[in-house]
């Protein structure tokens, strides 16, 4: 009985979503939107070294959503610290690339509903004896990706707490990991999944503890683009109910 009720309820939800899609303005049809992505933020968004094409969890997810919702999407790699200005300047139409929803960003853009949650972690060499307490209390060099929410949060925390470490800024999390390995910095701070991606590919690094609140990822849009947000929110709802969502998780998420 409960299984039948759940199945009936799901059918009603999908029917309502289908009716909602039909009610959306015609702007979606034959419209191409440009999605700005970080070129080196695996597994969410990156440029594939073999093909030279944008790839990743978010890239494939938005491509699926575009097809489902009746529009097309072009994924445009660009520098992360300039990606919100590019959105506001209409060089791109959205940012679906592992972008954290923050109060500061929400002042200038709107976000879709959250579609992923990820913890923030410290990363060191695999044979390092550093602990999270050591990282926060010693005058080490700590790598972060410029323009990220985790960098901004830890910088603010450092100013309040007086942590003695020195920030080293990078264009991407993988570049920070590279400098951990070659000894230019003692540790890095980043979202957990780029660290997991590096470890799964054989990098001799390890996670040494979480720090701060988890990040919630959403798609960033211009504040006035409310209809596009409706398309994307509906698209993610449909995607998460589709078997392809599990396929994406299995393909890109190493844990």
Predicted regions located by residue number:
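Extracytoplasmic small-molecule ligand-binding "clamshell" domains
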Residues: 30-99, 107, 244
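Hydrophobic residues within well-ordered alpha-helices
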Residues: 65, 87-88, 135, 180-181, ...
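A ligand-binding cleft/hinge motif common to bilobed small-molecule-binding domains
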Residues: 82-85, 98-107, 153-156, 179-213
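Beta->alpha turn/N-cap motifs
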Residues: 37-41, 76-81, 90-102, 118, ...
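Periplasmic-binding protein-like
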Residues: 39, 117-126, 192, 196-237, ...
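Ligand-binding cleft/hinge of the Venus flytrap
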Residues: 47-48, 62-69, 150-169, 199-203, ...
């Amino acid at each position: 009985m409960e299984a039948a009720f759940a199945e009936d309820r799901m059918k009603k939800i999908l029917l309502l979503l289908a009716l909602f899609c039909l009610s959306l303005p015609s702007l979606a049809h034959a419209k191409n939107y440009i999605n700005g992505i970080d070129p080196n933020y695996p597994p969410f968004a990156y440029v594939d070294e073999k093909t030279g094409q944008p790839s990743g969890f978010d890239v494939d997810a938005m491509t699926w959503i575009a097809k489902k919702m009746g529009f097309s999407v072009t994924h445009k790699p660009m520098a992360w610290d300039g990606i919100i200005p590019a959105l506001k300047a209409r060089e791109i139409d959205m940012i679906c690339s592992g972008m954290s929803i923050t109060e500061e960003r929400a002042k200038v853009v709107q976000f879709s509903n959250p579609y992923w949650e990820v913890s923030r972690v410290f990363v060191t060499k695999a044979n390092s004896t550093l602990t999270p307490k050591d990282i926060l209390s010693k005058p080490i060099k700590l790598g972060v990706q410029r323009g990220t929410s985790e960098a901004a949060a830890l910088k603010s925390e450092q100013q309040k707490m007086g942590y003695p470490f020195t920030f080293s800024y990078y264009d991407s999390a993988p570049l920070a990991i590279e400098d951990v390995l070659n000894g230019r910095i003692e540790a890095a701070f980043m979202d957990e999944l780029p660290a997991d991606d590096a470890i799964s590919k054989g990098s001799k690094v390890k996670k040494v503890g979480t720090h701060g609140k988890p990040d919630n990822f959403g798609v960033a849009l211009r504040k006035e683009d409310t209809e596009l947000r409706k398309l994307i929110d509906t698209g993610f709802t449909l995607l998460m109910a589709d078997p392809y969502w599990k396929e994406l998780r299995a393909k890109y998420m190493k844990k």
